[in-house]
């Protein structure tokens, strides 16, 4: 994030260059400002919050979680085959900038987040089930973003959560969703017991 005495307004300026998080496999990042083009390209496991991205954001992403609390460029999610992204669509035109060849868009459903406890050391609780708990996941990640960067944008969203939550869109690859559901179904099936001597 920019220095405290910097005259720039972070959420209105590109503060990180192109291809940041290229091929990231784990970890967390929080960027107070806008990213250049191809942000999180080939991301396969990192969790991140950014205040806007250029063209081709989340291109060829295979895992991880990206939360964008600003605008995006064109061709978002092109070739995205895994992971989940959330975009704050304040204007209502994100669908025109998203590459829908492999992903589906859905609203983030409201849920009770009053019991969300901010844990500085662990995101695993909200990252364990990418099919459910979207509002909790987004809320925790934005809270961490505010904590680590002092983002005024994040604070505004958190203070007006009921207003902003319906404007978030979840982006999830179709085949990834199907694979996760199949794994869940397999895990729920009773496993036959082996009998000695058979």
Where do the PLM segments sit?
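Long, distal/terminal scaffolding or interaction modules
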Residues: 1-198
């Amino acid at each position: 994030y920019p220095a405290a005495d910097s005259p720039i307004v972070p959420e209105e300026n590109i503060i990180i260059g192109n291809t940041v998080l290229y091929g990231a496999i784990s970890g967390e990042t929080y960027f107070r400002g806008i990213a250049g083009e191809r942000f999180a390209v080939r991301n396969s496991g990192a969790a991140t919050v950014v205040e806007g991205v250029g063209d081709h954001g989340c291109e060829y992403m295979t895992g991880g979680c990206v939360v964008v609390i600003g605008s995006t460029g064109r061709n978002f999610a092109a070739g995205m085959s895994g992971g989940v992204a959330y975009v704050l669509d304040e204007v209502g035109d994100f669908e025109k900038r998203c590459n829908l060849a492999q992903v589906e868009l859905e609203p983030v459903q409201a849920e009770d987040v009053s019991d969300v406890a901010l844990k500085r050391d662990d995101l695993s609780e909200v990252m364990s089930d990418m099919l459910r708990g979207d509002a909790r996941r987004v809320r925790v990640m934005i809270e961490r973003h505010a904590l680590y960067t002092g983002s005024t944008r994040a604070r505004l969203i958190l203070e007006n959560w009921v207003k902003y939550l319906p404007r978030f869109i979840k982006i999830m690859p179709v085949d990834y969703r199907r694979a996760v559901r199949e794994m869940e179904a397999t895990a729920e099936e009773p496993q036959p017991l082996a009998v000695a001597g058979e």
